[in-house]
């Protein structure tokens, strides 16, 4: 992958992760539902955007689904302790 495409992919991925972080913190502060704005649709939107970027990483052979699943399993097991 050429450097400018890699930089673009990494930049957009970082931005999408930041947006997911923002909605997660809004849920922590205000709950999933309040009078101002329900958070579930926003959470779905931002989590989906991050998933899209992970798919781009796989398509561009930066990571594999197997590697991601292995890491996810490791993290899940660690959190379950």
Regions found by a protein language model. Give the residues of each.
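Flexible "arm" and connector segments at domain edges
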Residues: 1-47, 51-81
